[in-house]
Amino acid sequence: DLDHPTQALADALWLQERFPDGLQGRKIAVSWAYSPSYAKPLSVPQGLAMLLPRLGADVVVAHPPGYQLVDACLEAARSGAESAGGSFQLTDDMDAAFEGAHVVYPKSWGPYELMLQRVDANRSGDEARMAEIEQACLEQNSRYRDWICDERRMALTEGGDALYMHCLPADIGDEVTPGVMARHRFNVAREANKKVYVIMALLAAAKVPDLVERLSH
């Protein structure tokens, strides 16, 4: 649950296409968003946080209390920003993350500390504790239904309509409003398409020892 390399690389490829001059100085908001299915993995936001600052982007991760990312991933994000001239920040304000952003990536992820407790309870076969944790997760999640990518928040972004991204499938009506998704449906489809080429490239690199030499001829 620490990283999602193929998704992060596919997203980077899509961003490279959209911003051919590079990501230096581009603000990218990676934000938690509400979803009824609260237990989504942290791998996508953490993968983005660790990769995009290394490409020079100014990455802001926004989440409400209880949805922090893993410390090791945060350290990697900060280190990448320092080495590449990008920046990395955390905030508990979705509006602040969206303000002036060139790219927004709102999606749900699970409450890490509670999820760890659930793993321990499951390992010990403690069904009563599992039920308690489930209830705590649902109650915590329901407090933040207003964390949604909507028209008002998109209006805060650079030019009033930043590039919307999502790893798909998005929870329309919860993570993002139908109107925002309708405007960006073509873009998220093109984003998803990049994953095919990234995976093909990774397989080729793994299977062909002299790949660079072969491609140069």
Spans of model-derived segments:
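Short, conserved loop/helix-junction motifs that constitute active-site signature segments
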Residues: G22-L23, P53, E151-D161, R183
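Phosphate/diphosphate ligand-binding glycine-rich loop within oxidoreductases
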Residues: D1-E17, I172
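Buried hydrophobic packing segments
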Residues: A8-L15, L48, I199, L203
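Adenosine-phosphate binding glycine-rich loop
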Residues: G159-H217
